[in-house]
Curated annotation (Swiss-Prot):
Family: Belongs to the thiamine-phosphate synthase family.
Gene3D superfamilies in UniProt: Aldolase class I (3.20.20.70)
Catalytic activity reported: 2-[(2R,5Z)-2-carboxy-4-methylthiazol-5(2H)-ylidene]ethyl phosphate + 4-amino-2-methyl-5-(diphosphooxymethyl)pyrimidine + 2 H(+) = thiamine phosphate + CO2 + diphosphate; 2-(2-carboxy-4-methylthiazol-5-yl)ethyl phosphate + 4-amino-2-methyl-5-(diphosphooxymethyl)pyrimidine + 2 H(+) = thiamine phosphate + CO2 + diphosphate; 4-methyl-5-(2-phosphooxyethyl)-thiazole + 4-amino-2-methyl-5-(diphosphooxymethyl)pyrimidine + H(+) = thiamine phosphate + diphosphate
Binding-site positions, Mg(2+): D69, D88
Protein name per the record: Thiamine-phosphate synthase
List of residues binding 4-amino-2-methyl-5-(diphosphooxymethyl)pyrimidine: Q36, L37, R38, M39, K40, N68, S106, K135
Record GO biological process: thiamine biosynthetic process; thiamine diphosphate biosynthetic process
InterPro entries for the chain: Aldolase_TIM, ThiamineP_synth_sf, ThiamineP_synth_TenI, TMP_synthase
Sites where the protein binds 2-[(2R,5Z)-2-carboxy-4-methylthiazol-5(2H)-ylidene]ethyl phosphate: T132, N133, T134, G162, V182, S183
Protein origin, superkingdom: Archaea
Amino acid sequence: MKFKDKLKFYVITDSNYSDEVSSVEKALKGGASSIQLRMKTSSTRKMIEVGNKLRTLTSEYDALFFVNDRLDVAQAVNADGIHVGIDDMPVSKIKEIAPNLIIGASAYNIDEMKTAEYEGADYLGVGAVYSTNTKLDARNLGLDGLKDISKIANLPIVAIGGINHSNVENVLECGVSGVAVVSAIVGAENILKSAENMHELIKKYIK
């Protein structure tokens, strides 16, 4: 299975909602195919401790494991990849240091998309499609903006930002390779059930 096929159901951790390890285990059981560890305020030691546990879980479920922003942590826990924003380490530098990692890059507009492609990213995280409480500084792109980028991008696109069970089908109709979700899964009362339901919706569009 190519890595692109595993981008379809991409879950990002958030300890404000639930413990990373237990929420990821339930999400994987419910069908998540990629996991991203995002721990912006934690110590490096804590990130590595949690990352090692998530690496074990994702391997058991044959899912991809990404670390947000931190190349050192991604390497320490033997992650499959890293996801970076426009202000983080340049994609080209990551490729020099860790050529085997899958690199995702955030893009809020066509210029940022082109920069990510030029620098050698492997996939794009495009959004925010809808307003979101998990990333308050995110710029809203909307469905039209997502469609515009989808039409011209040469890389797989993972849509992100405010995606939930009621709007995910509208997002998938834009021709993306996957959707990234935070609160709709890890913030759910029943994470397993929410993941299963989301997986069923995604499968209608991406086999």
